[in-house]
Regions:
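Glycine- and small/polar-enriched repetitive beta-structure motifs of secreted/surface proteins
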Residues: 1-194
């Protein structure tokens, strides 16, 4: 069974099951997707996939534009709100965490398996049809790893306020920065540890 409260909540649902939505426009375009939870104005608004998706969006505009992503968890306003394709297995908590991540339509592009906790943590960018891989990153702390834009990033870890905040280079995979403003000025470079 489904539970929907709010103007146009689950508006298009035909045979989706086990969905819970509360708020205006939550899960509005979902026709057949299952096991989603959307709480907050326009959370999961454009999701429309016929799979057991298990997405959880709590907060205004969370996962608002996503269409097919699965197993995402977002808590806070404007979290993962630009993601609009198959972004999956991401956990983002805090105002505007992963707010600009959008893997685009390129078949090889990935924005999966990331963890972002804190204000604007792991902001990301729109890949604009490029085969960018943005996977396995961890950002914990306000503005941690927030400057990557649309560049590739794999296995990068930033823990602490503004840790790796200036990192923009796509050749910085495997870098680990722990502590207040740790490697704050680093813009590129693989395998650094601080």
């Amino acid at each position: 069974s489904n539970h929907a409260i709010g103007y146009q909540s689950q508006l298009a649902n035909v045979d989706g099951v086990a969905n819970v939505s509360f708020g205006r426009g939550t899960l509005a375009t979902n026709v057949s997707g299952n096991h989603n939870t959307a709480i907050g104005h326009q959370a999961l608004e454009t999701f429309n996939s016929d799979v057991d998706a298990y997405n959880t969006a709590v907060g205004m505009n969370n996962l608002q534009a996503i269409t097919t992503g699965i197993y995402n968890t977002s808590v806070g306003a404007l979290v993962l709100d630009a993601a609009s394709f198959g972004e999956s297995f991401n956990t983002a908590i805090g105002f505007a965490a992963m707010t600009s991540v959008n893997e685009g339509a390129h078949a090889s592009a990935q924005a999966d398996h990331n963890v972002a906790v804190g204000y604007n943590a792991l902001e990301g960018g729109a890949f604009a049809g490029n085969p960018v891989v943005f996977t396995g990153n961890i950002a914990i702390g306000s503005l941690a790893l927030d400057g990557t834009g649309a560049n590739a990033q794999t296995g990068t870890i930033a823990i602490g306020y503004e840790a790796l905040t200036a990192l923009t280079g796509s050749s910085s995979s495997g870098t680990v920065a722990i502590g207040y403003q740790s490697m704050e000025a680093l813009t590129a470079g693989d395998g650094n540890t601080a």
